[in-house]
From Swiss-Prot:
CDD domains: GluRS_core (cd00808). Its EC number is 6.1.1.17. Belongs to the class-I aminoacyl-tRNA synthetase family. Glutamate--tRNA ligase type 1 subfamily. GO terms for molecular function: ATP binding; glutamate-tRNA ligase activity; tRNA binding; zinc ion binding. A motif ('KMSKS' region) lies at residues 259-263. Signal peptide: none annotated. Catalyzes the attachment of glutamate to tRNA(Glu) in a two-step reaction: glutamate is first activated by ATP to form Glu-AMP and then transferred to the acceptor end of tRNA(Glu). It holds the Pfam family tRNA-synt_1c. ATP binds at K262. The keyword Protein biosynthesis applies. It catalyses: tRNA(Glu) + L-glutamate + ATP = L-glutamyl-tRNA(Glu) + AMP + diphosphate. It is an enzyme of class 6 (ligase). This is Glutamate--tRNA ligase. The lineage of its organism: Bacteria, Pseudomonadati, Bdellovibrionota, Bdellovibrionia, Bdellovibrionales.
Amino acid sequence: MSSKISPHVRVRFAPSPTGYLHVGGARTALYNYLFAKKNGGEFILRIEDTDEARSTQESLRGVVDDLVWLGLKWDEGVDPVTLKDVGPNGPYRQSERLHIYKEIADQLLKEGKAYYCFMTEEDIEKQKAAAGSFAHLVSPYQDWTLDQALERLKTGDKAVVRFKTKNLVKDYIFTDLVRGEVKFPSDMVGDFVLLRSDGMPVYNFCCVVDDHLMKMTHVFRAEEHLPNTLRQLMIYEAMNWPTPEFGHMALILDEDRQKLSKRKGAVACGQLKDEGYLASAVLNFIALLGWSDPQGREILSVKDMLEVFDISRLNPSGAIFDRVKFKWMNAQHLRALPNAELWQAVAPFLARENMDLPTDPAWQSKSLDLFKPYMEILADAIELYRPLNDKSYVILPEADETLKWESTKAVLTSWKNLLQAHPSDYMTEEEFLKMQDEVKNQTGSKGKHLFMPIRVAVIGKPHGAELKTLVPLMKKSSLVARAEQALAKV
């Protein structure tokens, strides 16, 4: 087994388009991207779509869009817009490389390193029942000549192509860049399938062929792929191909130290985006699930990561997906954005609720200065801005008691008249407090008999947000209209 490989770094992220992009997949993509860019290499996007029943164009579109949202730009692979091949080592979809796998399988068959196996499912089950389910399959066809097998194929019988392992009696040892030395005894696996009876290749075979022909120098992937490595090393050896270096990353675990599952919250990048997580925060958070900054920083941009990323700092132990910390981290990224940029991110969430808010950039910036400290995710803006939306203003049943007080009508009348007399469209916090004092002077009302009716006339309920912060963001005409609505209920 040769270990000589090009020093020019080439790595890949190879998702299957059978669902969404999970945060674990996003972390794999990020580490490969950082490693490539840190070492002046290339990051390739390959699509492993040989599972015809489950692979969909919709899933592929979703995975590609999520990678684009995260900002992980690849150098070769499917085009992010057209999904067509871009690069000299394509096709980049395994479903378009079937002829390549067939050629390599034919070579292994001719060299006696693989064979056609005509065992049926029934044959295999019988052997398992007799030998025990943990025994390796022993095919009666492993010593057939290729000519014998080809003659039988002419009769219409179906066969898989199996890799022959019986002569490989030794340990397979490699240095995992995350876990150190890993040793596999060859008898861990029996003769494994390369091509199914319909000609479709299996994962381990495609993976080796593609990684070799696409000149991959390093393979960084999740720990769950570690058992696949033995079969892959055997194929590399049989083909006399150089092996890339491997690194297997620890699993991401939930708070109960179980494998992360969508049952306990969002784990799909698209869902996180819809909830209002920023791409920069997602990358920051997943980067620290198994890797640590040498300076101990918790808030990092991709630029920061690129300056210090070293694969040797990956931890082989499972990383906990702490959702509370994730929200906190998103809040730090959110609050660090310039107001104009943050408004662009917030606006789609407000638009979903059909909010009719001022378009003046100065007003938008002022409102964000007020609300930013209370936002952890972008969706938090919805409830913060709702009181400012005239379409959302309703007087709730909880205001009924306040509206029945004898003093309420005088308070609301004074409030409305002072609003109408105010010389400008908006007022400052100081002007609001003075106006509130003037209502007190005119009506003699104080305490809850002063504050609660005014709050009902502003937000539709007697308890809630501080008016001194909300009122300066509200147009005079809006405040007057709300006061009139409240007065009509007295």
